[in-house]
Regions:
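Flexible "cap/lid" subdomain of the alpha/beta-hydrolase fold that forms the substrate-access gate
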Residues: 3-34, 43-47, 91-121, 125, ...
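Conserved HGGG/HGGXW glycine-rich cap/lid loop of the alpha/beta-hydrolase fold
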Residues: 46-93
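A short, glycine- and basic residue-enriched loop/turn
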Residues: 65-66, 132, 285
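Alpha-helical macromolecular-interaction surfaces
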Residues: 71, 78, 105-108, 112, ...
Length: 308
């Protein structure tokens, strides 16, 4: 396989080890992780890393941040990988000069982070909103991706159906999100198969205390999620071909995307992708990294190693 060339690095792109002792709110506990800040034009991205070896990038969902992977990343790292967990723009402890977010803003941010860290290619594991950025990366910059594992979101070539409407019932509240409104409902039925401790929810939502992060909810949905959903509805990705081996995983208790619906929406995957596999995880809902961290790590490791 040809080695991809790194893009021209922004003049100010530089990673440096961060002392997080004075960060507010404090970072949640996660033994073994190191923390860096990658500075690029107008953006200071917090990146948590663990392990050494072939790189694996984990892209969090909404409203989570890097800590969503605190039970998954160490398991992958223990198998001999360097695991990189960035706080994407509008989340966690990343800081942006501009509050605007467009459809591919996070994609360009991610490419800058990969370049600043000297990562030519990496495996990518993504969940929920993070899967939008991962999907864009695999289609537009396949040379930067080894293999992809996508959690709780169907592939880009899925067909649209009225049966999808329940999956979007939360959207109006987020499109019109008012700063200060609670998001604790994300960790309730039908999204979780298990009861999530209050302390865990508090850790996920801690960065919402920062006005910048709370204010980012509407731009994320209006500027990125809705435009990308419109592209999916128009079948844009059905006119493209995915070359990256991809595993798509759902929780059995994810009532938005049960197996019969997913199979129906994603018929004839060989027509749209070189290699696309589906798996359904027992005792898990939409929030797979919370409900089944061991299973997520094992699925990813098996997929990375298979036929390699």
């Amino acid at each position: 396989m040809d080695t991809p060339e790194l893009r021209s690095r922004p003049d100010d792109a530089r990673p440096h080890v961060a002392s997080t002792a004075t960060w507010a709110p404090p970072l949640p506990e996660a033994p073994g992780f190191a923390h860096q800040v990658v500075e690029t034009t107008g953006l200071r991205s917090h990146v948590a890393t663990i392990g050494e070896g072939e790189p694996v990038v984990l892209l969090h969902g909404f409203p989570q941040h890097w800590w969503q992977w605190h039970q998954v990343a160490p398991r992958i790292a223990a198998a001999g990988y360097r695991v990189i967990c960035p706080d994407l723009r509008g989340a966690g402890w990343t800081e942006a000069d501009e509050r605007g977010i467009e459809r591919e803003t996070r994609l360009h941010d991610l490419l800058d982070i990969l370049d600043a860290l000297g990562l030519e290619r990496a495996h990518v594991v993504s969940h929920d909103m993070g899967a939008i950025t991962a999907l864009q990366l695999t289609y537009t910059h396949p040379e930067r991706v080894g293999r992809a594992v996508q959690l709780s979101i169907p592939p880009g070539f899925m067909s649209f159906s009225p049966r999808l409407l329940p999956a979007f019932r939360h959207m109006p509240k987020l499109i019109w999100h008012r700063p200060g409104n609670a998001l604790r409902g994300v960790w309730s039925d039908p999204y979780c198969a298990k009861v999530t401790p209050d302390a865990t929810i508090d850790a996920h939502l801690a960065p919402m205390q920062r006005r910048e992060i709370d204010d980012a909810v509407r731009p994320l949905y209006r500027g990125m999620v809705i435009p990308e959903a419109m592209r999916l509805a128009r079948g844009e990705y059905q006119r493209m071909h995915l070359t990256i081996p991809t595993l798509v995983a759902f929780g059995r208790h994810d009532t938005r995307f049960n197996e019969p619906l997913v199979r129906r929406l994603c018929e004839n995957p060989d027509r749209y992708a070189d290699r696309m596999e589906f798996v359904f995880v027992e005792n898990a809902g939409k929030l797979l990294p919370d409900d089944a961290p061991d299973a997520v790590a094992e699925l990813a490791l098996d997929f990375f190693d298979r036929d390699s």
